[in-house]
Regions:
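Short amphipathic alpha-helical segment that frequently serves as the phosphate-/nucleotide-binding helix
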Residues: 46, 263-264, 294
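C-terminal alpha-helix
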Residues: 296-304
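Catalytic histidine-centered segment of alpha/beta-hydrolase-like enzymes
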Residues: 281-290, 294
């Protein structure tokens, strides 16, 4: 858990807010007009709200922008007596949304932010207006057998091979010193963005073994298949999910989720919705192409009032 007031040399200048109503202290950013349309930005592995630092300012000129840190990430608390699962992260989000009484939300989800956004929507569709996916999957699309599986990605192969040797746990539970390497394995492309402040910001949530439990459990949750029951439990809400306007931004250098899989999954659910393919952009499009995300998000909202 990072010092709430650390701005990382002014690169994250947003007032901290906290919510402790769901068993841990959760940090979130809340910028822009309180009566504005709500954009709720969800990060994934192994990042935190810092991922959206270049988007919050421009977007908050027109919208209310809320950026939570998941339990075990960023400036949020890392309790050791909690389960770090898709279910728990989704339930944590639901508690925060209810606390803030957010409505007509534009959900933005990258990496694990996509499944969390999806599971939130199938259970709380009345609060969601639109969904903006970025290098992620909803997971409910029926795709052809010729489409690569998520398990075919370089990231998932790395996880599986490392579980046999102990490498996966060693690397991820030491994320404070390995976070850049992990992001490169997943598909981080923009090395020009990396400086001492960048390294410190992404390393700071993980000063020791225990603090990195969330970074370890995210991929294990998927690799082990333990997310399946919770995902299947949301099937009744898929009709509500696909009724929402949606868009997918897909960096084609993604090594966590095969781009062909992400696109096929999305098009199976939203066959007429836009897919924006980004050559040369990796898994972290917020880092690799920040201006593209802001422009496309604004246009998406304007096109779906």
């Amino acid at each position: 858990m990072i010092d709430l007031h650390d701005t990382f040399d002014g690169t994250f200048p947003f007032a901290p807010h906290t919510f402790d109503g769901h068993g841990f202290v959760q940090h979130y950013v809340d910028e822009g007009p309180r009566d504005g349309q709500v954009i709720l930005c969800l990060h994934g592995e192994p990042t935190w709200g810092y991922l959206y630092r270049k988007r919050v300012g421009p977007l908050s000129e027109h919208y209310r922008v809320v950026v939570p840190d998941h339990m075990g990430f960023g400036k949020s608390e890392t309790p050791l007596d909690r389960e770090y699962t898709l279910r728990s992260h989704t339930e944590n989000l639901a508690a925060l949304v209810e606390h803030l009484d957010l409505r007509d939300i534009t959900l933005v989800g990258q990496d694990w932010g996509g499944p969390i956004a999806t599971q939130f929507t199938v259970r709380h569709a009345e609060r969601v207006k639109r969904i903006f996916f970025a290098n992620t999957i909803a997971g409910y699309g029926r795709v052809g057998a010729d489409v690569p599986e998520v398990s075919d990605s370089g990231w998932f192969r790395w996880i599986g091979e490392g579980l046999e040797t102990g490498r996966t746990e060693q690397v991820l539970r030491n994320a404070g010193s390995t976070v850049l390497s992990v992001m490169k394995i997943i598909g981080f492309q923009n090395s020009a963005a990396v400086d001492d402040t960048w390294i410190r910001a992404y390393s700071a949530p993980f000063p020791d073994w225990d603090s990195a439990i969330g970074a370890y459990e995210f991929p294990i949750d998927a690799y082990s298949g333990r997310i399946a029951d919770y995902v299947m439990g949301g099937l009744d809400g898929v009709a509500d999910l696909v009724s929402k306007p949606a868009i997918l931004l897909e960096g084609l250098e993604d090594r966590a989720i095969p781009p062909a899989r992400a696109i096929a999954d999305f098009r199976a659910l939203w066959p007429d919705a836009p897919v924006v393919e980004l050559p040369g952009v990796g898994h972290f499009c917020q880092e690799d192409a920040p201006e593209i995300l802001v422009t496309n998000l604004h246009q998406f909202i304007q096109a779906n009032p």
